[in-house]
Regions:
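Long, amphipathic, Lys/Arg-enriched alpha-helical "connector/arm" segment
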Residues: 1-22
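Active-site/catalytic core of tyrosine-dependent DNA strand-transfer enzymes
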Residues: 4-8, 75-134
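Short pre-functional
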Residues: 24-39, 149
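Conserved tyrosine-mediated DNA breakage-rejoining catalytic core shared by Y-recombinases
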Residues: 43-85
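Catalytic-site neighborhood detector that most strongly recognizes the C-terminal catalytic loop/helix
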Residues: 1, 58-63, 102, 164-189
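Short, basic, alpha-helical segments at the C-terminal edge of helix-turn-helix-like DNA-binding modules
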Residues: 189-195
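Short, basic (Lys/Arg/His-rich) helix/loop patches that form interaction surfaces
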Residues: 12-18, 89, 122-162
């Protein structure tokens, strides 16, 4: 119950400070994109978007595997709102204004920039949590929270395995609960409504 109260506090929080608000919005976008990490969002290309979906490869963390995992997330109002709010300049290949238009994929400098962006987001999130009196979180927590919410709201273990991109379902079993089946896209859209994105 306390965790749910803390989540509501965080989702309803807004700040006049653009840097802090951006960090919180990117945390929400990470949740909405099935737990995409900051690196994924930095490198999201305009060519990854269709009218209805976001299609991209998610690079898993070094702790698990370096294999690329294909993601296919249905676009909804929450996702599109943040894509517009933080849109990269017209000439940029990127969706979001996180990287410079001239930053090249696959270079060490771009990799370092993404890590720096993630660090800054985490610092801002820590300050937000401190100001509203809840335990500290990081960008990574969006993925774990999305997974838990997905299972608690009727998503099956197999569906969660699919959207998380786990190679082995054993990795996903940490979220295992006996719940009825639902369509992934419908469930994800309902969960995203709770992000309070405005």
């Amino acid at each position: 119950k306390k965790k749910k109260e803390n989540w509501k506090k965080l989702m309803s929080y807004s700040t006049p400070y653009p840097r802090s608000q951006k960090a919180l919005d990117m945390f929400k976008l990470s949740y909405a994109l099935h737990g995409a990490n900051t690196n994924d969002m930095c490198k999201l290309l305009k060519s990854d978007l269709t009218e209805t979906h976001v299609k991209f490869f998610r690079k898993k963390t070094k702790k698990t595997s370096q294999e690329l995992v294909k993601r296919n997330v249905k676009r909804d109002e929450s996702i599109d709102f943040l894509f517009i709010k933080y849109a990269a300049p017209a000439g940029s290949p990127y969706v979001l204004d996180l990287l410079n238009p001239t930053d090249k994929l696959g270079t060490e400098s771009t990799h370092k920039r993404c890590k720096g962006i993630n660090r800054n987001f985490n610092r801002s999130l820590e300050k937000i949590c401190e100001s509203i009196g809840i335990p500290r979180i990081s960008m990574m927590w969006a993925r774990h929270q999305m997974s838990t919410d997905f299972r608690e709201n009727g998503g099956t273990l197999e569906q969660l395995n699919l959207i998380m991109g786990h190679k082995d379902i054993k990795t996903t079993k940490v979220y295992d609960k006996s719940l009825p089946n639902k369509k992934i896209e419908d469930l994800n859209e309902n969960l995203n409504k709770g992000l309070n994105i405005t």
